[in-house]
Structures are given as structure tokens and as C-alpha cells.
UniProtKB/Swiss-Prot annotation:
It comes from Salmonella paratyphi B (strain ATCC BAA-1250 / SPB7). Keywords: Aminoacyl-tRNA synthetase, ATP-binding, Cytoplasm, Ligase, Metal-binding, Nucleotide-binding, Protein biosynthesis, RNA-binding, tRNA-binding, Zinc. Belongs to the class-II aminoacyl-tRNA synthetase family. The gene is thrS. This is Threonine--tRNA ligase. Pfam families: HGTP_anticodon (PF03129), TGS (PF02824), tRNA-synt_2b (PF00587), tRNA_SAD (PF07973). Signal peptide: none annotated. Gene3D superfamilies: 3.10.20.30, 3.30.54.20, Anticodon-binding domain, Bira Bifunctional Protein, Domain 2, Threonyl-trna Synthetase, Chain A, domain 2.
């Protein structure tokens, strides 16, 4: 009979099989009431599942990350329960958990309207408030199939036929009269599923195949309590205000159009931000001793066959033909950098060789996945590749890590999650090589006092990698930086150097990206700053305004002086009220507005106002210029007097 070992090391002895709920009740009624599921020997199980042998057990509650995921999964079943009551002929497909919520794909003979979604959410609340028990039954494959055939659930039958072994015992979850199929676990009672909201609908092909029927996907969010739900909805509201697509239009940064899907038309102000970002990256390339190169954006298909990209990536590559040759528009820069490395004989004395490029890349992303600047088809990578010896890996990775944190801190990103992906089952190279490579990455992180977590088996077949995910002011995750070791591509493309022993050797290649896609990073910055770019990045840094025509000459002189000082400035001499001008430029998020009236002209000064509405008073012109230059030069995130 089972001996149950709890997380604190204490043990409970039973003379009969017990469930996690039984053990929780044995510990106390409060814990039993909070129990959602159990983790038995490291595996999540339903609260009602029996434990027959000695085992470790952790009780899962809504406070646990797994508990919240289970709540969300059960809310998907609740959605199914409600939709079958409102529209009984609906056929249910799949209803998984996603970030912050869940969705269900349904086959319905009507297009759901906003009113339908509101009615569906209302019915879900009515059902959840009944606090009914969710009953799990393990049945044979044949019984499960018969159940869904009788109910007309053709998609569930297809899942059984195509994805579940005949000797398996699927779990059927009974929500009163509604039955769904799932591996589970699920909540034991619907009292855990009170805090949710349906968010939107979208189209989705069955099994993601455009040859199949288009279903309707209903998205929802679910949380453990009302406070967490409201906080999430507030974050979404704030995110909508910060949407880079909306701000990009307001500030006239860029546009996109149907004739060039996923391609950016940069307007003057947006391109100014892009170029300033390039200047910043170039300053770091110089500091960390990179050479900058530029490769062709199109190369013969034969080269991509050698690299392995054609076999593994061709669906995402654009191609074109000329003079009976097929060319691929590059989706990445690395093969081109190896071609540059291969020009001329290289010695071990030439290594490490650090090669960077603002590479114009194109990938044939599905049209439905395109999203403003965040997901595009044409983009610019701040890409670099380091050619080095195995002995140099640790030092080079160390420098890459310092560069990543150096650059992210400039933008105020402080929360960065780091993951180290290790060897997959299918890989090249010896175990000794992988041991050393993984150790080099881990030690480099440790030497920089950077906490990280392992992603076991998630590395590429050609080498382990470090991923850097930064979190913005809304606590959204953006995976931007990578440091990837590559033991394959240099060999495939015949890269070599002459070692100290006069023998030819293959260099190790380190792929390094920090911002990732320049376009995407500008989208991230637009939302992070809500369009209030720090002065050094702002397209227009200063606007000089007159109050009446009598100050026009002074405004022009001051504007010229600011331009000569390297400041991006505009003069606004329109015959409008000064309050109107200030409001307009405040909405344009111009960092500084300099107002010139008769008093300022007479004193040789200027009234300084920030876009946040702070009046800095009447200041000496040369002092203002000096302070602005210092703020811009230091790439400060703070404005004057902040």
C-alpha cells in the first residue's frame, strides 16, 4: 500500500490507494478546497486519479503556475459546454491553452458576431456559477470513439483515429451533459473557473492546413482571481494605447500596403529612428572590435543546398530565376559571411574574426502571421558572426554577453531572462565537443553573474545556444538576442584556417544577434516608450516656435544655431496661437519646445517646455544647447530636469 512523500519530506502511509484529493483532505479541509490537481512522481495528474504505489506528491493549487494552466484548459471545456447549449449542432475541434488563456476551434453553421460572443460568455458564467463537479472517466479507445460518433463530433473521431493508439485509454471529462476528451488534468469543480473573459474570434484551418475546412477560433483569457483578471485587462488596454501600428500612423513613422505585404515603407521620421539605431549599433561594433561587411541579398540556389537551408527552409525562401539559374533571396546572412571569410588564406593569428552586417533579409512568412513591424517579410538583421578556435569560444561568448547587456541597458531594459539550450538527440559532433561547448556557454554566463535556466535538448543540431528574452514595461516577453555556436556551417562551406601546427582546421562559428530584426526592435521601442522616444532617438528633437511675427528672425537664427550644434530641429512660424502649436507638437511627442516671445528676444534667451508639460523657464540659449548635446551624446533616457 502506498507511502506518499510530500515536498517537505514528510510521509503519509495508507492501506489503500489514494488520490491527491484524499491526501489533501487528510492534511486539512483548507488545502482540499484549494486542490486543483497533483504532481505525482513529477507528472501532473487529476485530483481524482488514484495512487497505488509509493510516490512523491505535490498538491497543485491556483497559486501554482500549473494550477493556472489547468484553470485555463478547463475554461476551454467550459466554452465547449456553453456553445453546445446555445448552438447544439456545433462540432468541437481542439481547445488548448495558450499564453494568458485558451482558445477553442469550432465548426459552426453561422459566423459568430460580437453579440454571439457576449451571449456565449454570459452562458459560460451561468454554468460556472453552478459550481458543478467535473467527472473524469478513463474509457477504452472504442468506447471513446463510439461516444463521439453518437454525438456527431467528427473532429474528435478524427483525433482518435489519427492521433491516439487503439490500446490507449482516453480521458473523457463530463461537464454535466457535455463530454470532452483530453489528456488532462482538469479542475475537479467549476468553482475554480469564475474569472475569465472571451477576447476575440478568428479563422483557423483544421490542423493548420489550408486545404482543410476553415473553422472559427474563439479566444479567451482566464485567471485565478478577479484581481489578476482585471490587471491583465488593464495591461491589454494600456498595450492597445501603445500599439506601434497606431503610434506609427500618428507620428508618421512608416506605413505598409497590400502591394508589398510584410514590407515596410519607412517615412522620413521613422527612417531617422532607424538610422540613429544603426549609428548606435555601429558605435558598439567599433567598441567591441567588429568589422562591418555587406553581402549580396541574393545568391545561387546551389549555395543554399550546400548549407542545408534549401532542404530545411525552402518554404520560407523567396526565389527568382535569371539566365537558367535559380537564385534565393537570403533569409539570413551567415552563408554570405562564410564566403567573405573564405577569401584569402586565414591563419590562427587572424582569429577571432568578428564580422557584422546590417543584412537585408526576406522570409516568406504566412500572410496571416504578419503583424506591423513585429512580424514582417523584409527585415534588417543586426547580425554578426565570429570565426574562432575552440579555445577562444569562452572569451568570445563572454564578450557577446557583455555586449548584449550593454546595449539593452541603453534602452532601459532591466528584466532579461536567459536560457541555455543544450544538445538535441539528433546532432553532429562528439559528446566531448558538446560537453566543452555547453560548459563554455554556462561558464561565460556564470562569470558575468547571470542567472539562467537550461532548455534540455532544445539546441540546434549544430551547436548549443543562449537566448536572451527581454521584458518591457507591460511585462511582455520579447526574445531578441541569441548567441549560437555552429560546428556545421563552416565545414559545409569549406571554411578553414592554418593552425599553429601548419595543419588546416575548421573554425567554430558563433552566430550573434542582439536587437534581432531592426524593424521589430523599433516596434518594441515604440511600444515601450509609447512613442515618447528618448531625445537621442526622437526624429525631431526640438521645435522652436514664435508667438508673433516679430520673433520670426530670432526663431530662424536659433534654429540654425541648433542645427549647427547637431540637433534635429524644426522651426514653427505658422500664424497660429502658441497654445495650439504647443498642443500639436506635444501630440507629436517632440521632446523639447522652445518658445520665443519679445521678452526672450530681448534677453537672448528661450522659454523651454518639455513634451510632458514641464515648464523649465527662460534659459540661456548656449546653456540649453550644451545640455541638449550632453543628453543626446550620453543617450540618456531622462529629459532635462527629470
Amino acid at each position: 500500500m502506498p507511502v506518499i512523500t510530500l515536498p517537505d519530506g514528510s510521509q503519509r502511509h495508507y492501506d489503500h490507494p489514494v488520490s491527491p484529493m484524499d491526501v489533501a483532505l487528510d492534511i486539512g479541509p483548507g488545502l482540499a478546497k484549494a486542490t486543483i490537481a497533483g504532481r505525482v512522481n513529477g507528472e501532473l495528474v487529476d485530483a481524482s486519479d488514484l495512487i497505488e504505489n509509493d510516490a512523491t506528491l505535490a498538491i497543485i493549487t491556483a497559486k501554482d503556475e500549473e494550477g493556472l494552466e489547468i484553470i485555463r484548459h478547463s475554461c476551454a471545456h467550459l466554452l465547449g459546454h456553453a456553445i453546445k447549449q446555445l448552438w447544439p449542432h456545433t462540432k468541437m475541434a481542439i481547445g488548448p491553452v495558450v499564453d494568458n488563456g485558451f482558445y477553442y476551434d469550432v465548426d459552426l453553421d453561422r459566423t459568430l458576431t460580437q453579440e454571439d460572443v457576449e451571449a456565449l460568455e454570459k452562458r459560460m458564467h451561468e454554468l460556472a456559477e453552478k459550481n458543478y463537479d467535473v467527472i473524469k472517466k478513463k474509457v477504452s479507445w472504442h468506447d471513446a470513439r463510439e461516444t463521439f460518433v453518437k454525438r456527431g463530433e467528427t473532429y474528435k473521431v478524427a483525433i482518435l483515429d489519427e492521433n491516439i493508439a487503439h490500446d490507449d485509454k482516453p480521458g473523457l471529462y463530463h461537464h454535466e451533459e457535455y463530454v470532452d476528451m483530453c489528456r488532462g488534468p482538469h479542475v475537479p469543480n467549476m468553482r475554480f473557473c469564475h474569472h475569465f473573459k472571451l477576447m476575440k474570434t478568428a479563422g483557423a484551418y483544421w490542423r493548420g492546413d489550408s486545404n482543410n475546412k476553415m473553422l472559427q477560433r474563439i479566444y479567451g483569457t482566464a485567471w485565478a482571481d478577479k484581481k489578476a483578471l482585471n490587471a491583465y485587462l488593464q495591461r491589454l488596454e494600456e498595450a492597445a494605447k501603445r500599439d506601434h501600428r497606431k503610434i506609427g500612423k500618428q507620428l508618421d513613422l512608416y506605413h505598409m500596403q497590400e502591394e508589398a505585404p510584410g514590407m515596410v515603407f519607412w517615412h522620413n521620421d521613422g527612417w531617422t529612428i532607424f538610422r540613429e539605431l544603426e549609428v548606435f549599433v555601429r558605435s558598439k561594433l567599433k567598441e567591441y572590435q567588429y568589422q562591418e561587411v555587406k553581402g549580396p541579398f541574393m545568391m545561387d540556389r546551389v549555395l543554399w543546398e550546400k548549407t542545408g537551408h534549401w532542404d530545411n527552409y525552402k518554404d520560407a525562401m523567396f526565389t527568382t530565376s535569371s539566365e537558367n539559374r535559380e537564385y534565393c533571396i537570403k533569409p539570413m546572412n551567415c552563408p554570405g559571411h562564410v564566403q567573405i571569410f573564405n577569401q584569402g588564406l586565414k591563419s590562427y593569428r587572424d582569429l577571432p574574426l568578428r564580422m557584422a552586417e546590417f543584412g537585408s533579409c526576406h522570409r516568406n512568412e504566412p500572410s496571416g502571421a504578419l503583424h506591423g513591424l513585429m512580424r514582417v517579410r523584409g527585415f534588417t538583421q543586426d547580425d554578426a558572426h565570429i570565426f574562432c578556435t575552440e579555445e577562444q569560444i569562452r572569451d568570445e561568448v563572454n564578450a557577446c554577453i557583455r555586449m548584449v547587456y550593454d546595449m539593452y541597458s541603453t534602452f532601459g531594459f532591466e528584466k532579461i531572462v536567459v536560457k541555455l539550450s543544450t544538445r538535441p538527440d539528433k546532432r553532429i559532433g562528439s559528446d566531448e565537443m558538446w560537453d566543452r561547448a555547453e560548459a563554455d556557454l554556462a561558464v561565460a554566463l556564470e562569470e558575468n553573474n547571470i542567472p539562467f535556466e537550461y532548455q534540455l535538448g532544445e539546441g540546434a543540431f549544430y551547436g548549443p545556444k543562449i537566448e536572451f528574452t527581454l521584458y518591457d514595461c507591460l511585462d511582455r516577453a520579447w526574445q531578441c538576442g541569441t548567441v549560437q555556436l555552429d560546428f556545421s556551417l563552416p565545414s559545409r562551406l569549406s571554411a578553414s584556417y592554418v593552425g599553429e601546427d601548419n595543419e588546416r582546421k575548421v573554425p567554430v562559428m558563433i552566430h550573434r544577434a542582439i536587437l534581432g530584426s531592426m524593424e521589430r526592435f523599433i516596434g518594441i521601442l515604440t511600444e515601450e516608450f509609447a512613442g515618447f522616444f528618448p531625445t537621442w532617438l526622437a526624429p525631431v528633437q526640438v521645435v522652436v516656435m514664435n508667438i508673433t511675427d516679430s520673433q520670426s528672425e530670432y526663431v530662424n537664427e536659433l534654429t540654425q544655431k541648433l542645427q549647427n550644434a547637431g540637433i534635429r530641429v524644426k522651426a514653427d512660424l505658422r500664424n497660429e496661437k502658441i497654445g495650439f502649436k504647443i498642443r500639436e507638437h506635444t501630440l507629436r511627442r517632440v521632446p523639447y519646445m522652445l518658445v520665443c516671445g519679445d521678452k526672450e528676444v530681448e534677453a537672448g534667451k528661450v522659454a523651454v517646455r518639455t513634451r510632458r508639460g514641464k515648464d523649465l523657464g527662460s534659459l540661456d540659449v548656449n546653456d540649453v544647447i550644451e545640455k541638449l548635446q550632453q543628453e543626446i551624446r550620453s543617450r540618456s533616457l531622462q529629459q532635462l530636469e527629470e
